[in-house]
């Protein structure tokens, strides 16, 4: 098992790659909330934990928090991000 960090910026269609978006815009959602991402991960069966009062390194002035997720070593992070967005769009 490994632990990965997911910031809302990774899934935000309004952000550029330079600002932290990790997947293509077509797959992203507009302004995803940490709570929605957390709920999506729980629906997908992942063990997740919200960490509040943290700033994304590219937006150090904005306190948003992130999510820690425990996943199997063989699952790529981008695969999980795509699944989250699919779930959020439903």
Swiss-Prot record:
Predominant location category: cytoplasm
Pfam families, sorted: SRP19 (PF01922)
Entry annotated with the keyword Cell wall biogenesis/degradation: no
Molecular function via GO = 7S RNA binding
- Superkingdom assignment: Archaea
- Localization terms from the record: Cytoplasm
Keyword RNA-binding among UniProt keywords: yes
Q: Name one GO biological process term.
A: SRP-dependent cotranslational protein targeting to membrane, signal sequence recognition
As given in the record, the signal peptide range reads none
Q: Which GO terms describe its cellular component?
A: signal recognition particle
- Role according to the record: Involved in targeting and insertion of nascent membrane proteins into the cytoplasmic membrane. Binds directly to 7S RNA and mediates binding of the 54 kDa subunit of the SRP.
Provide the family line.
Belongs to the SRP19 family.
> Quaternary structure?
Part of the signal recognition particle protein translocation system, which is composed of SRP and FtsY. Archaeal SRP consists of a 7S RNA molecule of 300 nucleotides and two protein subunits: SRP54 and SRP19.
Q: What is this protein called?
A: Signal recognition particle 19 kDa protein
Organism annotation? Methanococcus aeolicus (strain ATCC BAA-1280 / DSM 17508 / OCM 812 / Nankai-3)
Per the record, the gene is srp19
């Amino acid at each position: 098992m490994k632990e990965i960090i997911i910031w809302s910026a990774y899934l935000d269609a309004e952000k550029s790659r330079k600002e932290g978006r990790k997947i293509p815009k077509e797959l992203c959602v507009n302004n995803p909330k940490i709570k929605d991402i957390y709920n999506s991960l729980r629906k997908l069966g992942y063990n997740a934990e919200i960490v509040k009062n943290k700033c994304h390194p590219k937006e150090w002035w904005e306190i948003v928090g992130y999510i820690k997720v425990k996943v199997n070593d063989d699952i790529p992070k981008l695969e999980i991000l795509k699944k989250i967005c699919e779930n959020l769009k439903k």
